[in-house]
Amino acid sequence: MSLALIGFLMVATFMTLIMTKRMTPLVALIVVPTLFALLAGFHAGLGDMMIDGLKKLAPTGVMLLFAILFFSTMTDTGLFDPLVGKLIRLVHGDPMRILIGSVVLCALVSLDGDGSTTYIITMAAMLPLYKRFDMNRLHLVCLLMVTSGVMNLTPWGGPTARAASALKLDPATLFVPLIPGMIAGLAFLILLAIHFGRKERRRIGKVELPAVLDAADLAVSQWPEARRPKLIWFNAVLVIALLVLLVWGVLPLPILMMLAFAIAMIANYPDTKSQKERIAAHAGNVLAVVGLIFAAGIFTGILSGTGMVEAMSKEVVGVIPPFLGPYMAPITALLSLPGTFFISNDAFYFGMLPILAEAGAHYGVEPMAIARASLMGQPVHLLSPLVPSTYLLVSLAGVDLADHQRFALVPAALCCLVMTVVGMLVLAFPFVG
């Protein structure tokens, strides 16, 4: 049995187990790759592969740990209560306005380039509205994920930087022609939000709000004793400073999150008893997310260490018949959907993209065009169980990963299609070389 086939079977088995809910993602991420690695004969060195995978995802795990603690602490202090209060008054109990607002807020927050931070902030602001009006949280999770996938194409976002690095291209030159496609993707999401809004209107109608709402009605924070209204401006400046430093890149993101959390704790809860209470209040959420991140390290470590990723990439490229060569740009866009879903962004852009670019060059398709086309699948990529921030998103929303994947797959794929068509229309990449 070829290594590529084993790799595809491993991913298919994993997806089947979690989508049929026969195994939790945490357990499947550990057990499935281990069994398939042993089946492929990689008894020696298996532990080293796992450790390598854990090392690569360790910074992400640390970042998420302290990001959840920091933004949860900010929520506890009441920092987001005024924002949610303003939103509640603006939407006037209309589910459609809430859904459209979710897309707009996520698009703005996504400019920081980090999906985890985006999810934490937008969830803190929007989830209370969905709970209050008993709206379907799968709508929220779908809209946030696909919006984040569209906004992920900014030059400081991971995929664009990877594609530029892999083919030695200028990120800014790579990015600018993609802007019309991104705008089209966001327009599609607004229409999707309107569609979801009509469904919610039929289901729950327009919620009548009291003429006068007290502070408790508008609060996101769950523990009144943890609120710090006198420190709201300090906390706001702290969050803004964190986001500025994040974009500026003066320190690694995990370090920034650790420092921000420590400062927030000292300023808002100076006594150790209060600090322990705040940490304990969010420990369950932290454990659920970080545990999945490290389990994903086992999966990606084995996928890379065994050489399955390279073998899978070559097999995918090898099935493209010569007569389709001139159409390498749209083919690359199409391949980016399953490609970035089944293997990590690193594996796709550093392993598969150079092969696709080389194949395209033989038919007159420039590497720049192939690179742009390869970014079209990002909304579907975020559905992948290999994406750490996806676990954070579903955990914060309290929805099942498999339910989210089934619900969001078609909208995400349609958004990719819209971006691809517009990308070809504005000549970001050609239909035919």
Question: Where do the language-model regions lie?
Answer:
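Long, contiguous bundles of hydrophobic transmembrane helices that form the permeation core
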Residues: 1, 39, 176, 180-278, ...
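Membrane-interfacial loop-to-helix junctions in multi-pass transporters
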Residues: 1-5, 55-61, 87-101, 132-140, ...
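Hydrophobic mid-bilayer segments of alpha-helices in multi-pass membrane transport proteins
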Residues: 4-15, 22-41, 61-68, 232-243, ...
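Transmembrane alpha-helix interface/packing and boundary motifs in multi-pass membrane proteins
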Residues: 14-22, 71, 105-114, 145-151, ...
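Core transmembrane alpha-helical segments of multi-pass membrane transporters/permeases
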Residues: 27, 46-81, 107, 254-255, ...
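Hydrophobic alpha-helical transmembrane segments of multi-pass integral membrane proteins
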Residues: 63-66, 93-125, 319-358, 362-363, ...
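Re-entrant/interfacial helical elements at transmembrane boundaries that shape
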Residues: 82-85, 117-129, 157-169, 311-312, ...
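Membrane-core helix-loop-helix motifs of multi-pass transport proteins
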Residues: 128-213, 220, 366, 376, ...
